Amino acid sequence: MGRAGGGSGDGGEEPAALEAVRSFERWKKKYSRRTRRLRLQRKERERPEWQVEREGIGRLVQRYPQINANEIQRFSDFPLSKKTLKGLQEAQYRMVTEIQRQTIGLALQGKDVLGAAKTGSGKTLAFIVPALELLYRLQWTSADGLGVLIISPTRELAFQTFKVLRKVGKNHDFSAGLIIGGKDLKEESERIHHINMLICTPGRLLQHMDETSYFYASDLQMLILDEADRILDMGFADTMNAIIENLPKKRQTLLFSATQTKSVKDLARLSLKDPEYVWVHEKAKFSTPATLDQNYIVCELQHKINVLYSFLRSHLKKKSIVFFASCKEVQYLFRVFCKLQPGLPVLALHGKQQQMKRMEVYTCFVRKKAAVLFATDIAARGLDFPAVNWVIQFDCPEDANTYIHRVGRTARYKEGGEALLVLLPSEEKGMVEQLAQRKVPVNEIKINPEKITDIQKRMQAFLAQDQELKEKAQRCFVSYLRSVYLMKNKEVFDVFKLPLAEYALSLGLAMAPRVRFLQKVQKQLSVKETSERNPLKDTEQNKNTISSLNKEGMEECRINPSGKLSVNRSKEEENRKETEQYPPSSEGTEESGSECESKEASEEEEKEGALSSRVPYTNSMQFFEDDDDDDDTKDLDLLTVKRRDVFDLESKDSPALNASNSKMKKKTTKTQEAKKILKKKFKVNTRIVFTEDGELVQQWPPVQKSGLAKADEEDDASGINLDKVREILREEDKFDKEEYRKKIKEKHREKRLKEKAARREARNKNARAEGETVAVLAHSGSEDEFDPSTLPDPDKYKDSDEEQDTESEDSYRELEEKSGRKRRSHGGSIAAGEMPQKRKKAKFSQEEDPFLPLDTGLSLAEDEELVLHLLKSHS
């Protein structure tokens, strides 16, 4: 029994020992794992930070090929760095849009991307995130220079992109810069070489490439074009070509826009390598956001301003943007609507403003809850104005792409919005067809004419009160016609179908201003029609014009090879026909009248016209030579035609033509022009002042009397001969001194006559007083007291002497000799009463007897009365 019990005890001890061994082994494994982990953590802490970052970058790069765009819903689903994800979360960017889902993965893999999506779909983040990740992968620093270049077409869009970049990339160590026009160039050039991510406009970037010596882009890694179709078109063609030449060929390129370009020529300029085309909404039913309600109205040109005012009065709590065709329209209508006070804030944004003013207007409109912004197409692309309710296109857009970008300022990122397009009857058919081809749903709506407010009379009153506002209205009129004429699609835009007189009245003008380029266009069209009707007559005219080419010049023939040249007419006939077709304004009639005053002036104008006709403009451009008051189309010289005589054929064929050209190129100086005017005996800028009696008081400029001046007027030599001018001035100075001397003598003569009259009156008064003298022997009461006011005023004659001293010393001596006054001292004081002598006396010498009786000029009774008064006062 004992053994059995002992055996059972031994069997119980063995499992307990095994359990203890197992627990020890488990503890040992746990301890070893813990020590291994601590050892690894210690090693990681000992490793430099850059090495840890590089390993993390390596893990991110390994995940790039595994990106599946269909599975991504958030930014955290992309293999992005912690710094980028933190910036996105802090800026409240969590969910991705369709364009971001499909382009970020391709850009992270280093491919060239052409992305197109609807307006307000988040294209800015689609290129900012890959740009940040690229520089983070390369561990870029400020010492490495420029790594990413973002080019925007407008300053406002560049500023908006810069703000988004600052939000998302604030946790990174890169430096970002904004380079746009309107800022201090010197300050920008001092900082530009430290910038890693540069956001700019094309013009200012090219200026820095030309003028900033230490700015270079040889290490550029990524080029991004925002609104690429606008940057690559004709407006920026030369600038972009120059910029691309300075960029390295080996780089990544991203192009984004709402209306993307597929031109092979444009893409070849950018040196794209196997680009990925991402058209997110290519298969969508409409090319505009589904939340956008789009309508159009048909309105006559003269009623458009009334419709706009009535619309704003009925939408006082809405935020609206009104697009115009030109800057002059925005400037004028902004001023007028500020005076009309529609009931909500009115702002203006156009290209003629200073940069700080543009930024102020942009930020002000962003903050306003209810306002209206008058803008040109600089606000049509990319700008993200929050909570815009209405987009009104006051002037018809150039094409469907411009329409899409304009209406894209509302209905941003799943928000609602409304768009209204104002069309003329001549524009309706062609524009609606274009929009239908681009899958833009537009519905026509009607206006209730009873709710339209007529503001034409109020505008006329404003123009009558303000001359500057009237000039702005005239510029607005001409600028609108020019913008319509320059449109490419002539099926939609026909300037000759516009009611010009009615449109001028709607702007507040009494009559339509003179539009010179339109008159010239109409003349050319009439000549063309007559030549098509009578081809035989046209050939005869061509022969006549060819025979007179030595006088007229050959450049116009090269521009118009069809031979349809205008018929030569005299200046008077042209002006007469122009006035019959278009009644000019008062200013125009004055100009035409002054042009035809003399035969010589008309000949000079014909010469100038011949010179201007040799300038190689195209037909559409040469009509703007006379209109220099509006510079909306100052960059149109891109379309000039340049021809060179390589083999010197023209000089051999027409030596007489070359001789005439050399004569015509001789420039007349301003001095010669002024002398020509003087020869015609025009009195320029003369001002003559007459008295009430008709006598000449003053003439300006004064007439030169010397013979040298008259001889110089007849001299045709250019420039100024200083020696001759000095001689003329000396001669003229003699005449001036003589004239001045005569004036002084006349002034002194008048003064002497006045003094004689005063002395004569004093003598007569003394003579009358002698017959009524009464002697006062004693002081008797207040009634018989001496009145000092009866004495003559001594200061009267003293002041006259002081005035004589100030006039001139010579005249003072002359008056002293003739007046002969006596000055005596009595009791150490100067006598208070000085009176002019009754007769002329000789000069007193200094050795004269001081005890001679003093002649005060008073009667005997007055002298006695004065003595008694003085004695009483001493006692």
UniProtKB/Swiss-Prot annotation:
Helicase C-terminal domain segment(s): 291-453
Entry keyword annotation includes Nucleotide-binding: yes
Feature: compositional bias, Acidic residues: 624-633, 800-809
CDD domains, A to Z: DEADc_DDX10, SF2_C_DEAD
InterPro entries, per the entry: DEAD/DEAH_box_helicase_dom, Helicase_ATP-bd, Helicase_C-like, P-loop_NTPase, RNA-helicase_DEAD-box_CS, RNA_helicase_DEAD_Q_motif, SPB4-like_CTE
Biased composition (Basic and acidic residues): 529-541, 569-580, 752-771, 810-819
Chemical reaction(s) catalysed: ATP + H2O = ADP + phosphate + H(+)
GO MF annotations, alphabetized: ATP binding; ATP hydrolysis activity; RNA binding; RNA helicase activity
Keywords assigned by UniProt, alphabetized: ATP-binding, Coiled coil, Helicase, Hydrolase, Nucleotide-binding, RNA-binding
Binding site for ATP: 93-95, 100, 117-124
Residue ranges of domain Helicase ATP-binding in the record: 104-278
Residue window of motif Q motif: 73-101
Disulfide bonds: none
Entry GO CC: nucleus
GO biological process, one term: rRNA processing
Motif DEAD box mapped to chain: 226-229
SMART domains in alphabetical order: DEXDc, DUF4217, HELICc
UniProt feature coiled coil, ranges: 736-773
EC number: 3.6.4.13
Region (Disordered) residue spans: 528-633, 653-672, 743-856
Domain notes: The Q motif is unique to and characteristic of the DEAD box family of RNA helicases and controls ATP binding and hydrolysis.
General function of this protein: Putative ATP-dependent RNA helicase.
Family designation: Belongs to the DEAD box helicase family. DDX10/DBP4 subfamily.
Protein name: Probable ATP-dependent RNA helicase DDX10
Gene giving rise to this polypeptide: DDX10
